[in-house]
Amino acid sequence: MPTPSMEDYIEQIYLLIDEKGYARVSDIAEALSVHPSSVTKMVQKLDKDEYLIYEKYRGLVLTAKGKKIGERLVYRHELLEQFMRIIGVDESKIYNDVEGIEHHLSWEAIDRIGDLVQYFEEDDFRIETLRAVQKANGEQSK
């Protein structure tokens, strides 16, 4: 299993390849706000652990294992963002909140959150009911 830091890199590499068709060390460094030398070290570790294939000065490609995990990590991130929106978290806080919790949840918890997101999205009335509860609770705490 990849570490949380490895997950961040795999997720970002997956997104860059999906968006641009490739991922360069400089692109990864910029996206993660880290030094290129840090990216090179991590990419070498990810290569050793068979998440990607890296050739110095030629670039990198995700292996089947890396693609599968990258896809799952992007799904997890997007699902948690959906969940935050459903429960009414302010849009400006969602990204940081998701970044803060995504590595600490089990895949079972992610699957259950997926069930909850599906439950709310299947019927708008459920979200309206949640908003009414939140409004009532907000007024009670004033």
UniProtKB/Swiss-Prot annotation:
Please give the chief subcellular localization of this protein: cytoplasm
InterPro entries attached here? DtxR_MntR_Metal-Reg, Fe_dep_repressor, Fe_dep_repressor_sf, HTH_DTXR, HTH_tscrpt_reg_MntR, Iron_dep_repressor, WH-like_DNA-bd_sf, WH_DNA-bd_sf
> Is Transcription set as a keyword in this record?
yes
> What would you give as a GO molecular function for this chain, any one?
protein dimerization activity
User: Would I find Hydrolase among this entry's keywords?
Assistant: no
The UniProt keyword set, sorted, is: Activator, Cytoplasm, DNA-binding, Manganese, Metal-binding, Repressor, Transcription, Transcription regulation
Q: Which residues bind Mn(2+) 1?
A: 8, 99, 102-103
Q: Name one GO cellular component term.
A: cytoplasm
Every HTH dtxR-type domain range: 1-63
**An example of a Gene Ontology BP annotation on this entry?**
intracellular manganese ion homeostasis
In which residues is Mn(2+) 2 bound?
11, 77, 99, 102
Report the activity regulation comment: DNA binding is strongly activated by Mn(2+).
Where does it live in the cell? Answer: Cytoplasm
| SUBUNIT field | Homodimer.
State the family it belongs to: Belongs to the DtxR/MntR family.
Q: Function of this protein?
A: Central regulator of manganese homeostasis.
Q: What is this protein called?
A: HTH-type transcriptional regulator MntR
Source organism of this protein record: Bacillus cytotoxicus (strain DSM 22905 / CIP 110041 / 391-98 / NVH 391-98)
